[in-house]
């Protein structure tokens, strides 16, 4: 990626998360890592950030690699903060809503759209200088194999909004372009 900015180009090899400040038009690399397919980034109420990498189902504490690394350098291998149950994942969120019970506050929510069709839920806890998360019962699960939750966010009303891609075929052209189930 190369993005031209008023302050000069921002370059990364492979994947990255960027930070944009609208008032100053600053656009900078926030996280540069060899993600397979980054599909989730969320901050908790304390400003800690967590990153979900879709393809492998990896989830990371962002603080460890949220910092300046000059192109083409990358951060080394990072420890995941939860043991993945399924892959791939798509979209993450932290529960922070009066609409949810007290025991769910601060839980990490993680969509899954292939092996498990629903929203997984993990109880966050401190682990040394980092974090760990333990699975608790899923927030929701669909028996419809076409349910593909790909993002989720809390709205100003406190409700959780979930985007459903709803598609019988997913992948990078493993299926014929003329497959009758495509985009149904």
Region spans (language model):
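Beta-propeller domains with acidic blade repeats across secreted/periplasmic ectodomains
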Residues: 1-184
